[in-house]
């Protein structure tokens, strides 16, 4: 199952980091031009005043609000100066101020920073992008920066020959990309191609920020498609072998998100033959978060049958089995979600059982209070039971039925639904029906037909119906005719009169199995129940064509119920 998830699939995000802290700001007080061996002062009067004010503010920086009118005017004066030294001083001041004071700011605060960002001087670019990256930690600022056109100069800086400038620009874009409102704009801005290129940078800081930015772009299907079109897949796959744990984590998580989409899985399958091998290896990583994302990536890939087989053939099962032993809940959840998808393929049922998963799955079912883990666990058991009588027997022998009986009445609704579905599949095994009845599962299935969840009701009824067919000993049905919760009798009456064709079909079919059981006690109980007899006769006399507003499938379903009721009605006389 792909993730919604997610997901629940781990919508992981990273924040961009500045590559290096700019030096502390020093305000140039007497810049000039060399004339006859002397430096003549060239500051305008307003610049002199701004420098003096800024020096005073910096000396008392702990008590000054640099985003208020006076300090901001002084900084802006330096920004708009024609003097490069004053511009550098302003950029460095903004970088230091924003590192320590992150808050929502207005356009007046952002305008001078964005102007500095467009400067051609690398030192100014580096400090300005660091300041903007700091401001972009705040969600409100992220939106405003983009609205004010901050992308364009950042994209240009990503292509700078200066590594420090590159790194800070990418770090800023990484932060901006964590906001949902910005992601599609980034995807359309032309930033993905340089980001993808920088993900292969020789500078690990640039590579880390670029990979994190790519990860932040994988949280919507449209943006994922833009990313794939920009050629990100082969680069992300190559980064799985990175020695940097952050790069490994970002690339693994990005690929996991990309694999949510069926079209992308096909591209991965055709172009990346070693992807599964890389991900299996990463499940043995020393980093739990890398292990977790590797398992989730395999889970998403295993939404396709070819990948389900490939993971098993690539010897992925022992690595997943090891993750089951972890005490780290997210890791166990990722592993069991992966094995659930792998278990969908009939050819994988026996290898999974032979790898020793059954005992672990049953233990996990009872040991975990995590609803998702329980759902994935019991769903895996159901998948393993789907096509083999032998597998059904091994699942029962592993204690799965006793564990379900113990837990199901108090389990969350989703877990109840999965458990009753599993019991319904197990109840199809002709050689197991007597064993299941002896284990007492009717005692929990009957009350669950009263559930307020329609799936739990239907699954429980289907399990009872399956158990009623060709079982040697019908004592359980006789003994539970009236208890618990109204017993078999009330269950049949409710479903026969429900008006739901699926429920009606289950009930009529169950009545037929009980009548054909050759157990006279059951025949007498059925014939003496006026409500059951009347309900069967009423169903048998219905118009088999259904109502005018019914769709074709609904008409077919109702027709089957009517035909089955016509077969049962004479047997109740």
Swiss-Prot record:
Keywords: Lipoprotein, Membrane, Repeat, Vacuole
Keyword Lipoprotein in record: yes
The organism's place on the tree of life at top rank: Eukaryota
MF annotations from Gene Ontology: protein-membrane adaptor activity
Topological type in the membrane: Lipid-anchor
Functional summary from the UniProt entry: Functions in both vacuole inheritance and protein targeting from the cytoplasm to vacuole.
The name this protein goes by in its record: Vacuolar protein 8
Source organism of this protein record: Yarrowia lipolytica (strain CLIB 122 / E 150)
């Amino acid at each position: 199952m792909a993730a919604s998830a997610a997901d629940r699939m781990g919508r992981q995000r990273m924040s961009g980091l500045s590559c290096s802290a700019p030096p502390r700001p020093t305000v140039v007080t007497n810049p000039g031009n060399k004339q006859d061996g002397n430096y003549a002062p060239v500051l305008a009067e307003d610049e002199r005043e701004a420098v003096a004010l800024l020096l005073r503010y910096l000396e008392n920086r702990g008590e000054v609000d640099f985003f208020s009118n006076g300090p901001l005017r002084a900084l802006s004066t330096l920004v708009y100066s024609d003097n490069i030294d004053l511009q550098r001083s302003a950029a460095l001041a903004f970088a230091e101020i924003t590192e320590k004071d992150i808050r929502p700011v207005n356009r007046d605060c952002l305008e001078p920073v964005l102007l500095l960002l467009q400067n051609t001087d690398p030192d100014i670019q580096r400090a300005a992008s660091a300041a903007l990256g700091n401001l972009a930690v705040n969600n409100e600022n992220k939106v405003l920066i983009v609205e004010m056109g901050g992308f364009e100069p950042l994209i240009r800086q990503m292509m700078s020959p200066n590594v420090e400038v590159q790194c800070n620009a990418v770090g800023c874009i990484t932060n901006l990309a964590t906001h949902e409102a910005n992601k599609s704009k980034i995807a359309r801005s032309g930033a993905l191609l340089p980001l993808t290129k920088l993900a292969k940078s020789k500078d690990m800081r640039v590579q880390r920020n670029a990979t994190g930015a790519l990860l932040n772009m994988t949280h919507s299907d449209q943006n994922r498609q833009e990313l794939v079109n920009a050629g990100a897949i082969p680069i992300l796959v190559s980064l799985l072998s990175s020695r940097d744990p952050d790069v490994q984590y970002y690339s693994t998580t990005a690929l996991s998100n990309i694999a949510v989409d069926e079209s992308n899985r096909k591209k991965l399958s055709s172009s990346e033959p070693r992807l599964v091998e890389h991900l299996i290896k990463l499940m043995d990583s020393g980093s739990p978060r890398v292990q977790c994302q590797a398992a989730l990536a395999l889970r998403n890939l295993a939404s396709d049958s070819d990948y389900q087989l490939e993971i098993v053939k690539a010897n992925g099962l022992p690595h997943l089995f090891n993750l089951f032993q972890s005490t780290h809940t997210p890791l166990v959840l990722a592993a069991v979600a992966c094995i659930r998808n792998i278990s969908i393929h009939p050819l994988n049922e026996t290898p999974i059982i032979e790898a020793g998963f059954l005992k672990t799955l049953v233990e996990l079912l009872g040991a975990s209070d995590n609803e998702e883990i329980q759902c994935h666990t019991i769903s895996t058991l159901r998948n393993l039971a789907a096509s083999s009588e032998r597998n059904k027997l091994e699942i029962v022998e592993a204690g799965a039925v006793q564990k379900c009986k113990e837990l199901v009445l108090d389990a969350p609704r989703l877990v109840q639904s999965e458990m009753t579905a599993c019991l319904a599949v197990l109840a199809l095994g002709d050689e197991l029906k007597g064993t299941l009845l002896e284990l007492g599962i009717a005692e929990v299935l009957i009350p669950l037909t009263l559930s307020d969840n329609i799936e739990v009701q239907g699954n429980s009824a289907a399990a009872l119906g399956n158990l009623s067919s060709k079982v040697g000993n019908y004592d359980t049905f006789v003994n539970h005719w009236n208890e618990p919760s109204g017993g078999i009798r009330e269950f049949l009456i409710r479903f026969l009169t429900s008006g739901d064709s699926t429920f009606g079909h289950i009930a009529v079919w169950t009545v037929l199995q009980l009548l054909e059981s050759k157990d006279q006690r059951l025949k007498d109980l059925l014939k003496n129940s006026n409500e059951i007899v009347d309900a069967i006769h009423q169903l048998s006399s219905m118009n088999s064509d259904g109502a005018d507003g019914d769709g074709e499938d609904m008409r077919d379903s109702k027709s089957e119920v009517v035909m089955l009721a016509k077969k049962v009605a004479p047997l109740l006389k």
